[in-house]
Amino acid sequence: MTKNEIIERCRWARDHNESHPSRQWPMGEQLAVALVLRDRSWLDSTNHTTETATDMVCERAGLSAFEFTGWLNDIRAALETEQR
């Protein structure tokens, strides 16, 4: 699960699914997109907290908690740049 893969998933969610992840994607990707797009209602619907989702994404992406913050911010910055 790379930054570019999650950026593409976020674009799709934003453009085609009211900014929600697709339930057809692997769970790690769903959680990553929900975290990037700040989709708390989606996390709630899957019985995940921000903390449990972060833990799972870190595990799947091979990131430490410290690295995750930068990873998340990089993805958000890339998406924000596109919308300007």
Regions found by a protein language model. Name each.
Residues 3, 28-33, 50, 68:
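Short runs of predominantly hydrophobic/aromatic residues within well-ordered alpha helices
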Residues 5, 18, 35-36, 64:
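Intrinsically disordered, low-complexity regions enriched in Ser/Pro/Gly/Gln/His and often acidic
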Residues 5-10, 34, 56, 72:
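General helical secondary-structure elements
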Residues 19-24, 45-84:
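Polybasic, proline/glycine-rich intrinsically disordered low-complexity segments
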Residues 30-42:
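Short, hydrophobic/amphipathic alpha-helical patches that form generic packing surfaces
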